[in-house]
C-alpha cells in the first residue's frame, strides 16, 4: 500500500512538472540564447567577406509638417523601412517549435550605417528598440521618422509653386563592395503611393520618384538611393486672401475713371484706394514667404499694382491741374478788360468836363446833363456787354478745353487698361509656366 501511494505521488509531481515548464527551457529562450550567445555585432554578418550585404530601402511619406522658405528647410513625417539579411541569425524552425520569426534588440545585432545626407537637424522619431528576424536571417527594421532636411525651395511661382526635395540614403563608411543598396518595392509603386498621405494640409503630394546610382569619391565608391519628394502647394487660401482683394481694388480704381476729369472727388477716391491698398499690403506681408534667392511673382504683382495706382492718381492730378490753370488764366482777362474800360471812361469824362464849363452857357449845360448821363450809362452798358461776351468766350474755351481733357483722359484710360491687361496676361502665363516645371 505504501508503495502504491509513492508511485501515485511521483506521477502527480511529474505531471505538474511537465505542465509548467521553466522559462529557461522554452523554445523561444533557447533560440534567442543560441542566436546571440556567440554573436558579434561588430562584424558584418556574412560568411564570405568578399560578398556585399544588400540593404533594401523603402519610404512612404505621411505628411509635410513645415516648409521653412527663409532657412531652406523641409520637415516631413514618413514611414521608413530597412531590410537586410544576416547570415548569422538563421535557424531551423522545426527544431524550435516551428518558430518562424522573433524580435531581437537592435542594439544586440549588427545594423547598417545608413544616413540621410540632407539632414540638418536632430532626427525626431520614437525609440523603437526591436527588429524582426525570420528563420532565414532576414531582418526588418520599420520605424516612423521626422526628417528635417535641407532643400532648395523656389518661391518664384508662389502660391502656385511646386517643390522638389531630395532625400539621399547611403552608408557613411562602407563602400559598395561591403554594403549595397536596393529597392524594397517597385519604383513605380513607390512613386504612386499616396494612401497614407494627409491631404488636409497645405501641401499636396504629387510623387516620390527614386533613383539608384553609385557616387564615386576619393574614399571609394558608395551606393546611393535618392528619393525625390515632389509636393505642390494648395493655392486656394492664398488666392482668396491675397489675389482676389488686390484684383477687387484694381477694378475699383478702374471704375474711378468714369468720374468726370474735373471732379475733385475723383482724386479723393483714388487716394483712398491707394491708402487702402497700402494698408492691405502691410497687413498681408507676413503671408508671403520671404526668400533671399529670388523675388516671387506675387511680390512683383503687388508692386506693379501699387505703381499702377500711383500712376492713375498722378494722371488725375495732372488733368485737374491743367484744367484749373486754364480756367484761372481765362478768368483774369475779362477783369483786365473791365478795368481798362472804366479807366478810359473816367479819363474821357475828366477831359470833357473842363471844356464844357468854358464854352457852353448855363442853359445849355442844363440840357447837356441828361445827355451826359445817358452817355455814361451807355458806356457802362457797353462795358458790361463786353465783359459778358468775354465771359462767354472764356466759358466756351473752357468747355472746349474740358472736352479735350475728356478725350485725353479716355486715351490715358485705354492705355492704362491695355498695360494692365498685358501685365495680367504675362503674370498668368508665368504662373502657369512655372507651376508646370
UniProtKB/Swiss-Prot annotation:
What are the cysteine partners in each disulfide bond? Answer: 151-165
Give GO BP annotations, semicolon-separated: cellular response to growth factor stimulus; chemical synaptic transmission; inorganic cation transmembrane transport; monoatomic ion transmembrane transport; regulation of membrane potential; serotonin receptor signaling pathway; serotonin-gated cation-selective signaling pathway
Span-the-membrane segments of this chain are: 236-255, 267-284, 296-324, 411-434
Q: Name one GO molecular function term.
A: excitatory extracellular ligand-gated monoatomic ion channel activity
Q: Which PANTHER family match?
A: NEUROTRANSMITTER GATED ION CHANNEL (PTHR18945)
User: How the protein assembles, per its UniProt entry?
Assistant: Forms homopentameric as well as heteropentameric serotonin-activated cation-selective channel complexes with HTR3A. The homomeric complex is not functional. Heteropentameric complexes display properties which resemble that of neuronal serotonin-activated channels in vivo.
Domain comment, as recorded: The HA-stretch region of HTR3B seems to confer increased conductance to HTR3A/HTR3B heteromers compared to that of HTR3A homomers.
Its name, as the record gives it, is 5-hydroxytryptamine receptor 3B
Organism encoding this protein:
Rattus norvegicus (Rat)
GN (gene name): Htr3b
Amino acid at each position: 500500500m505504501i508503495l502504491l501511494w509513492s508511485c501515485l505521488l511521483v506521477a502527480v509531481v511529474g505531471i505538474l512538472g511537465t505542465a509548467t515548464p521553466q522559462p529557461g527551457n522554452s523554445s523561444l529562450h533557447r533560440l534567442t540564447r543560441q542566436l546571440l550567445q556567440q554573436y558579434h555585432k561588430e562584424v558584418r554578418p556574412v560568411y564570405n567577406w568578399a560578398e556585399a550585404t544588400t540593404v533594401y530601402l523603402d519610404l512612404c511619406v505621411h505628411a509635410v509638417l513645415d516648409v521653412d522658405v527663409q532657412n531652406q528647410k523641409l520637415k516631413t513625417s514618413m514611414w521608413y523601412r530597412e531590410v537586410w539579411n544576416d547570415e548569422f541569425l538563421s535557424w531551423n524552425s522545426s527544431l524550435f517549435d516551428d518558430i518562424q520569426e522573433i524580435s531581437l534588440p537592435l542594439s544586440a545585432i549588427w545594423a547598417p550605417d545608413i544616413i540621410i545626407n540632407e539632414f540638418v537637424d536632430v532626427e525626431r522619431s520614437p525609440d523603437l528598440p526591436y527588429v524582426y528576424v525570420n528563420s532565414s536571417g532576414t531582418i526588418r527594421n520599420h520605424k516612423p521618422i521626422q526628417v528635417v532636411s535641407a532643400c532648395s525651395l523656389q518661391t518664384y511661382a508662389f502660391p502656385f509653386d511646386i517643390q522638389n526635395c531630395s532625400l539621399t540614403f547611403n552608408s557613411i563608411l562602407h563602400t559598395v563592395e561591403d554594403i549595397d543598396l536596393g529597392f524594397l518595392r517597385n519604383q513605380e509603386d513607390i512613386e504612386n503611393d499616396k494612401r497614407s498621405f494627409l491631404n488636409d494640409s497645405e501641401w499636396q503630394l504629387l510623387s516620390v520618384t527614386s533613383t539608384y546610382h553609385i557616387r564615386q569619391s576619393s574614399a571609394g565608391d558608395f551606393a546611393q538611393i535618392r528619393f525625390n519628394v515632389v509636393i505642390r502647394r494648395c493655392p486656394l487660401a492664398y488666392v482668396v486672401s491675397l489675389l482676389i482683394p488686390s484684383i477687387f481694388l484694381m477694378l475699383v480704381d478702374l471704375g474711378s475713371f468714369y468720374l468726370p476729369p474735373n471732379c475733385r472727388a475723383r482724386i479723393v477716391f483714388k487716394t483712398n484706394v491707394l491708402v487702402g491698398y497700402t494698408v492691405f499690403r502691410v497687413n498681408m506681408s507676413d503671408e508671403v514667404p520671404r526668400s533671399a534667392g529670388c523675388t516671387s511673382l506675387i511680390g512683383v504683382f503687388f508692386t506693379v499694382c501699387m505703381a499702377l495706382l500711383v500712376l492713375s492718381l498722378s494722371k488725375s492730378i495732372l488733368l485737374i491741374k491743367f484744367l484749373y490753370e486754364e480756367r484761372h488764366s481765362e478768368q483774369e482777362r475779362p477783369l483786365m478788360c473791365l478795368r481798362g474800360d472804366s479807366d478810359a471812361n473816367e479819363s474821357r469824362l475828366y477831359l470833357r468836363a473842363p471844356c464844357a464849363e468854358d464854352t457852353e452857357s448855363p442853359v445849355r449845360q442844363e440840357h447837356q446833363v441828361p445827355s451826359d448821363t445817358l452817355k455814361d450809362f451807355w458806356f457802362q452798358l457797353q462795358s458790361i456787354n463786353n465783359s459778358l461776351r468775354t465771359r462767354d468766350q472764356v466759358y466756351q474755351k473752357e468747355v472746349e478745353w474740358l472736352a479735350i481733357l475728356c478725350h485725353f483722359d479716355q486715351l490715358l484710360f485705354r492705355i492704362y487698361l491695355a498695360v494692365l491687361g498685358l501685365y495680367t496676361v504675362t503674370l498668368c502665363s508665368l504662373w502657369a509656366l512655372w507651376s508646370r516645371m
